[in-house]
Swiss-Prot record:
It catalyses: 2 a phenolic donor + H2O2 = 2 a phenolic radical donor + 2 H2O. This is Peroxidase 27. The lineage of its organism: Eukaryota, Viridiplantae, Streptophyta, Embryophyta, Tracheophyta. There are 73 peroxidase genes in A.thaliana. Binds 1 heme b (iron(II)-protoporphyrin IX) group per subunit. InterPro entries: Haem_peroxidase, Haem_peroxidase_sf, Peroxidase_pln, Peroxidases_AS, Peroxidases_heam-ligand_BS, Secretory_peroxidase. The active site is at 66 (proton acceptor). Pfam families: peroxidase. Belongs to the peroxidase family. Classical plant (class III) peroxidase subfamily. It comes from Arabidopsis thaliana.
């Protein structure tokens, strides 16, 4: 079933991406002549790593999301900066893992295509291949990005697990993404984990009166309180209990039952458009979810890209040239 879904997605993307020129200079197969081995090399690195640690899928997906939402998809989240002043040192990025996969991919590519492939393109490919490794969606990745030189901890302003629907829609629109993209990309939480500190107020003091969030199913809230005590700072919770290692539709089913882990998950029911998209995924048994996810990932991957002579091609992904 997963293989057939990926085939359908790939066919739809060939029609979509080749029929519409990308004015930003990105295209599928940008390196077809200069580094034809690119995708095979990256895929092998990702699959080898995820065979050993399948839970890396969610952090790698988040890494691409976090990169694109700050300064655009320019690989700035990968940079190490003096005194921990780069993006990766910001609180929302402290839980990112898998930087070694980017490093290993870059090192392997430098052996066969030195100075050709950008780190920002590697990250885009890694995010896709991580989903495929989990039998999730596949899509044609547009390449041609160049790497940014700036990474500033003070510029990290990402959508938050505490955000309401108005803030979420505003943040996504600022990146050229609409309500459907918000819902579909939130579906990536099907493989996610959350930590107790992000739930403390929602479970124990939502309005400052020792109460829980009324938008959270009471039975589910009781289960969460057993796992997350008020002072718990370390326990990790599955965002899609029982299915967090599989990229599937169950996230939307949970949200519709008021069992989304974060306030931002519950918020998807607070707007007529986003609620309709959630219910549509359930009603159609997610028949278009894999395809829609790929479409939204391609759209996000066009955010603020550097192309042409802008930026650079880094020699290593952790430092500018």
């Amino acid at each position: 079933m997963a293989a057939s879904k990926r085939l359908v997605v790939s066919c739809l993307f060939l029609v979509l991406l080749f029929a519409q020129a990308n004015s930003q200079g990105l295209k599928v197969g940008f390196y077809s002549k200069t580094c034809p081995q690119l995708e095979g090399i990256v895929k092998k690195v990702v699959f080898d790593a995820m065979n050993k640690a399948p839970t890396l899928g969610a952090p790698l997906l988040r890494m691409f999301f976090h990169d694109c939402f700050v300064r655009g998809c320019d690989g700035s989240v990968l940079l190490d900066k003096p005194n921990n002043q780069g993006e990766k040192s910001a609180v929302p990025n402290l839980s990112l893992r898998g930087f070694g996969i980017i490093d290993d991919s870059k090192a392997a590519l430098e052996k066969v295509c030195p100075g050709i492939v950008s780190c920002s393109d590697i990250l885009a490919l890694v995010a896709r291949d991580a989903m495929v490794a989990l039998e999730g969606p596949s899509w044609e990745v547009e390449t041609g990005r160049r790497d940014g030189r700036v990474s500033n901890i003070n510029e990290v302003n990402l959508p938050s697990p505490f955000d309401n629907i108005t803030k979420l829609i505003s943040d996504f629109r600022s990146k050229g993404l609409n309500e459907k993209d918000l819902v579909i990309l939130s579906g990536g939480h099907t493989i996610g984990m959350g930590h107790c500190p992000l739930l403390t107020n929602r479970l124990y003091n939502f309005t400052g009166k020792g109460d829980s969030d009324p938008s959270l199913d009471s039975e589910y809230a009781a289960k969460l309180r057993k796992k997350c005590k008020p002072t718990d700072t370390t326990t990790a919770l599955e965002m899609d209990p029982g299915s967090f290692k599989t990229f599937d539709l169950s996230y939307f089913t949970l949200v519709a039952k008021r069992r989304g882990l974060f306030q931002s998950d519950a918020a998807l029911l607070d707007n007529s458009k986003t609620r309709a998209y959630v219910l549509q995924q359930i009603r159609t048994h997610g028949s278009m979810f894999f395809n829609d996810f790929g479409v939204s990932m391609v759209k996000m991957g066009r955010t603020g890209v550097l192309t042409g002579k802008a930026g650079e091609i880094r020699k290593t992904c952790r430092s500018a040239n």
